[in-house]
Curated annotation (Swiss-Prot):
Cofactor, free-text remark: Binds 1 [4Fe-4S] cluster.
Chief subcellular location: membrane
Gene3D superfamilies cross-referenced by the UniProt entry: 3.40.50.12280
Broad class of enzyme this protein falls into: translocase
Lineage start: Bacteria, Bacillati, Chloroflexota, Chloroflexia, Chloroflexales
Summary of subunit composition and partner proteins: NDH-1 is composed of 14 different subunits. Subunits NuoB, C, D, E, F, and G constitute the peripheral sector of the complex.
Protein species of origin: Roseiflexus sp. (strain RS-1)
Family: Belongs to the complex I 20 kDa subunit family.
Gene (UniProt): nuoB1
Protein name according to UniProt: NADH-quinone oxidoreductase subunit B 1
Amino acid sequence: MSDDREIQLEAEKHGVFLTTMQRFYNWGRRSSIWPLSFGLACCAIEMMATGLARFDLARFGAEMFRASPRQADLMIVAGTVTKKMAPQVVRLYNQMPEPRYVISMGACATSGGPFRDGYNVLRGIDLLIPVDVYIPGCPPRPEALLHALMTLQKQIDAQRLNQVRWYGKREAKEYPVPTFGKHGLEIDGKLIDPVGGLPLVSPYTSPTHGEMRSGMIEHPELVRHFPIMDETVERESPYKATGIAIEIAHNDLKRPAVEVDHAEDERR
């Protein structure tokens, strides 16, 4: 191995570059990662700052933010993913050509962040699509996004052409687009992100290898009931509903019911 290295160094002195086809191919892909122009919330402001002159994303060949997913290699999920937006994220991901990568930027995209107990926020985009790199923070600084990009480049350098999922004549995998069911987002009739109480297991991603996840996302054990998700609630108009009882509101906020002593009020 040392002899090969000496030969390579000697050849470089004479303007000859020796490498393997695999390393050359990976070098080309890692040096021209085109992100999708796609921002969801406040993390997108930091993503925009990363592309400006101070941080100079062009050093990594990733300054070409594309308006079309068919011309993009990388999806940066920057911000809170609401359940109304989640199907569109999956559609955009399915339209990206292989090889395609995903960076989950910020606490909201990774686990729901401070809104994870809300009825309308997806608790992690990896419930729907695979994620290659996670960035913690609320919001992460541009330096964190640059570090994530360098981490992704290292992953690309380590790839072998005969082992990646997109090499050869294999068909690109289409990830199912969730639909709105009676109680929330569903895939094939199965609730993918229930409101409250149930632990979540991502079917696609682990933080290290992009394989099946074995751990569970922590979540409170108490089941919460939200009026708009309750079976007894019927919507009369966009701003009016029937069936919302005081008990439901108490369950929603997890406050014990307060009994009022009207006799005591009369004595006063």
